[in-house]
Amino acid sequence: MTMSDDTPNEVNHVDIDFPPKTADDFFRRGLKSAQLGIPDKAAADFEEAAWLAPENHDIQFNLGVAYLSMADFEQAINNFTKAIELKPGVADMYGNRAVAHAAIGEDEQSEVDVAEAVRLGAPPDGLGAVIDYVKEQRK
């Protein structure tokens, strides 16, 4: 058995820097960046992917998550809303949008999304704890 001379970091770096051409390429690179905690780079790749495949709910959802992690709550809401329009009935989409609404003080909209997320299977205690934390951070 032979071992590669590449360290794991070098391998991951190569995987991320390949020249993307398709929506899937940009999406996969965005996921890698998100996993590495680089939300701005993830968002840039997800934006490219969304340009190439605007009707892909996974891209819109992950774009929303990237913006949520960068505290761009209005943009996150826009992307979660688009994801919901493309594929209604996914608890995580409503739950994340609820968090974004709560972060900017839109408590009524947040409560509506929390109720829908819970109806679709989100754990009420977990989502409630996140919403409470976000509201505390607003103060």
Set out the residue ranges of the language-model regions.
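Alpha-helical tetratricopeptide repeat
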Residues: 1-139
